[in-house]
Amino acid sequence: MARITVEDCLKQIPNRFELALAATYRARQLVQGHTPKVDAKDKPTVTALREIAAGQVGIEMLKKVPS
């Protein structure tokens, strides 16, 4: 079972709302076939949170969202 906490991710992205948006956007990228930056045995949402907690993905995800 995946063990990732919001507190681990909040160290990288302190704003909870930006964290949720960044994780959502990254999870969508993973579903579309982008390569995971960490071990990807979990669902895309958990993998996205693991990437954020590891510092592999950050707030820059929000700058890539098309308007």
Curated annotation (Swiss-Prot):
An annotated GO BP: DNA-templated transcription
Gene3D superfamilies for this protein: 3.90.940.10
Disulfides per UniProt: none
Entry keyword Signal: no
Top-rank taxon, per record: Bacteria
An annotated Gene Ontology molecular function: DNA-directed RNA polymerase activity
Keyword annotations from UniProtKB, A to Z: DNA-directed RNA polymerase, Nucleotidyltransferase, Transcription, Transferase
EC number(s) per entry: 2.7.7.6
Stored InterPro entries: DNA-dir_RNA_pol_omega, Pol_omega/Rpo6/RPB6, RPB6/omega-like_sf
Gene Ontology CC: DNA-directed RNA polymerase complex
PANTHER family the record matches: DNA-DIRECTED RNA POLYMERASE SUBUNIT OMEGA (PTHR34476:SF1)
Quaternary structure (record): The RNAP catalytic core consists of 2 alpha, 1 beta, 1 beta' and 1 omega subunit. When a sigma factor is associated with the core the holoenzyme is formed, which can initiate transcription.
Cited function: Promotes RNA polymerase assembly. Latches the N- and C-terminal regions of the beta' subunit thereby facilitating its interaction with the beta and alpha subunits.
Similarity comment text for this entry: Belongs to the RNA polymerase subunit omega family.
UniProt name for this protein: DNA-directed RNA polymerase subunit omega
Classification of source organism: Bacteria, Pseudomonadati, Pseudomonadota, Betaproteobacteria, Burkholderiales
Gene behind the chain: rpoZ
